[in-house]
Regions:
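Structural recognition of the beta-strand scaffold that forms the well-ordered cores
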Residues: 86-89, 113-117, 138-141, 178-182, ...
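Short low-complexity, flexible loop/linker segments enriched in glycine and/or proline
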Residues: 129-132, 155-157, 217-220, 279-284
Length: 297
């Protein structure tokens, strides 16, 4: 009986060893699998979508990143100031007839703006782009194909910007200004750093409204209400050139903002260390050589 008991005990011990051994191996395999997956996730840049929370009329919104966080990448979404200065920017994905009216309103009010264009826009509308430059506006880089750039590596990211730079230089005979706006508002810390390394300033925004839906264009009243309530000192304004409403109300919006005490400056003035000395150029009737004054530094 004692021999049998010892045999049973030995079997029990061996069984336990086998169970623990299998469990250990499985744990190691599962642990290794999780580790590899975690490494893959960690290696992939975290995609972010630029967003704003408008909480108080005529005050800066709560943004996804602080000005200090963005500053390390030469990126901006507004100017930290109490001065009633605005920076107008337009995203141009395609042309549907509203840009001439937008340019007319800007010219009437002597307002400098930045137009962020894509490859297709430049290919199909070279004369409009040349008019933008002739009237003193900045042409910014919105990428060539308007993809989600947030997950791109350096080579692919650089190619998207360089393709548009090359076409712009072929079309206009001048170098493109080094301002970048992330397509679709999607970005990562990684490509903010890549843009900085390529000499770009990334330009987000602090004032916008839903103006891009072609079948759901806001009424004049809806648009005016949002644009007048959301305006604040130092705002970078994002509007879409494809908006019929924007083309129709921009003259009135600029007038209202001026009546509220606002004036307008160029992105070049926002990022320059010397401040906004150049603003006086745009506030006079001297439009003889606006291209030179608005040329990239």
């Amino acid at each position: 009986d004692n021999g049998m008991d010892r045999m049973e005990q030995l079997k029990a011990v061996l069984s336990l060893c086998l169970i623990f051994g299998v469990a250990f191996c499985l744990g190691s395999v599962v642990g290794h699998t999780v580790s590899v997956r975690d490494q893959a996730v960690m290696a992939r840049p975290a995609q972010k979508d630029w967003g704003l929370s408008f909480q108080e009329d005529n005050k800066p919104p709560v943004a996804d990143e602080s000005m200090e966080q963005l500053a390390q990448y030469d990126a901006f979404y507004a100017e930290n100031t109490t001065e009633k200065v605005l920076y107008l920017t337009f995203d141009c994905g395609y042309e549907n007839g509203n840009t001439p009216a937008i340019l007319d309103a800007l010219k009437k009010h002597h307002v400098p703006a930045a137009f962020f264009i894509v490859g297709n826009y430049l290919e199909k509308n070279p004369d409009l782009v040349k008019r933008m430059r002739a009237e003193g506006h900045i042409i910014g880089n919105h990428s060539y194909h308007h993809p989600d750039m947030s997950q791109m590596g350096k080579e692919e990211f650089q190619k998207e910007l360089a393709q548009l730079e090359d076409l712009y230089e072929q079309t206009t005979g001048e170098k493109m200004a080094k301002f970048y706006r992330p397509p679709q508002g999607k970005y990562s810390d990684n490509n903010l750093q890549l843009a900085k390394e390529l000499g770009y300033r990334t330009i987000f925004w602090s004032l916008a409204y839903v103006d891009w839906k072609q079948e759901e264009q806001p009424t004049h009243e809806e648009a005016m209400s949002k644009l007048l309530k959301r305006v604040h000192p130092g705002a970078i304004v994002l509007l879409h050139n494809t908006s019929r409403t924007n083309g129709e109300i921009l003259d009135e919006v600029l007038t209202k903002w001026e009546e509220m005490g606002y004036h307008f400056a160029s992105l070049e003035e926002l990022v320059s260390s010397g401040g906004r000395e150049a603003r006086s150029f745009f506030l006079t009737d001297n439009q003889e050589n606006p291209v030179k004054s608005a040329a990239p530094t």
